[in-house]
Amino acid sequence: DGDFDYVSKGDLNGNGLLDAYDIMSVAVALNDGVSPRKVENVAGEVTIEADKKQYNAGDVAVITVSGKGMKSVNGLSFALPYDAQEWEYVGVEAPALGQMYNMTYDRLHTNGDKVLYPTFVNLGEQPNIEGDATLMVVKMKAKKKQKFALKHTNGMLVDKHQNVVLF
């Protein structure tokens, strides 16, 4: 994939992606940086569910990303690969993520893979995500009649000290 050089320069955790972990390394230094005070290590469970199992052409899938037991979440990201012949990215809403900067990117890779990368990070010292919440809602438009079969990969929650929980 011709994206390797682009990704490799900023891929600090070596997973082949520019994700919340990599972005957090810079984001914690912005806007006067983050407080050195100790926080609990990041924790939480994330679930991703569509509103229906079956979609007709033109239907919009509402994909809810929920967090349970969130602690010290300063950034999060995941990848959602999809077939551009079957789905079209419509948008993402994330009111529960407060001041987090939305770096979501709908990317067509040089090898033809289409992947949505919902990515949110705090810039500098901002409130963390704590507790249970609907983290975001991703909307995808079906281009044909189909069952919902999209699966996320490379999900992570990151705290301001770059501790990580994978999902």
Please identify what each model-predicted range represents.
Residues 3-19:
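Acidic, divalent-cation-chelating loop motifs in proteins
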